[in-house]
Design a protein with these regions (language model features):
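Second-shell loop/turn segments in exported
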Residues: 42-49, 100-108, 120, 132-136
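Active-site or metal-binding loop neighborhoods of secreted/extracellular toxin and effector enzymes
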Residues: 155-160, 164-180, 186-191
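Bacterial N-terminal signal peptides that target proteins for export
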Residues: 1-9
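Catalytic cysteine-centered active loop of the rhodanese-like fold, especially the PTP/DSP P-loop
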Residues: 113-166
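Flexible, polar/low-complexity N-terminal or interdomain linker segments that lie immediately upstream
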Residues: 8, 17-84, 179-192
Length: 192
């Protein structure tokens, strides 16, 4: 019995000593403010530097400003220098899929990929309307919109409920493939 109590006390002490390490490892936000874990969880109603859109507002925007660019930031597995189609993905018609650019901390290649594609689709104009989205309750689009804001883009929109809301409204989705990650970006210090 004494041994059982000692073992139990030892386990409790060991668990309590490990708890702070575990909690520190799963911090929701990085020091620079980007969400870095639990990406599929409730998101805030607003985001600094961007206007939050529902489906009706997005449809109006696309009608009033047809040059608006839609940017899907849903993840896609990257392995051995290429995207792996582990599941079919569909997105809003006319979208550019910039996979893996909504993570909290981007490796340099993904940052270059993001910046280069934004510069290209906006024709270098920081006032070009850009709409970021993912799925509902997805922090990836929140991070990507915030990242674009910090890059100096000024006409930003966050389609908070994303693909799920579009589909629930009975609107069409199209099969999608992520934009290519240029081979030069695979080199750690390559310029865009």
């Amino acid at each position: 019995m004494k041994h059982c109590l000692a073992l139990h006390a030892g386990l409790l002490l060991g668990t309590s000593l490990l708890a702070p390490v575990t909690l520190a490892e799963v911090a929701l936000f990085a020091a620079d403010g980007y969400r870095q874990t639990q990406y599929r969880s409730p998101t805030p109603a607003a985001l600094e530097g961007a206007r939050t859109l529902d489906t009706a507002a997005l449809q109006r925007l696309l009608h009033e400003q047809p040059h608006t660019r839609l940017i899907d930031v849903y993840r896609r597995t990257w392995l051995n220098g290429r995207f792996i189609e582990d599941e079919a993905h569909a997105n809003l018609p006319g979208s550019l899929w910039l996979a893996n650019t909504g993570d909290g901390q981007l490796e340099p290649r993904w940052q270059r990929y993001f910046e280069t594609h934004l510069r290209n689709i906006s024709q270098g104009d920081p006032d070009w309307p850009l709409v970021f989205y993912c799925r509902s309750d997805c922090w990836l689009s929140w991070n990507a919109t915030r990242r674009a804001y910090h890059l100096g883009y000024r006409q930003l929109y966050w389609y908070r409920d994303g693909i799920d809301a579009w589909e629930q409204a009975g609107l069409p989705l199209v099969p999608a493939q992520p934009a290519e990650l240029p081979g030069a970006f695979l080199t750690p210090n390559a310029a865009p």
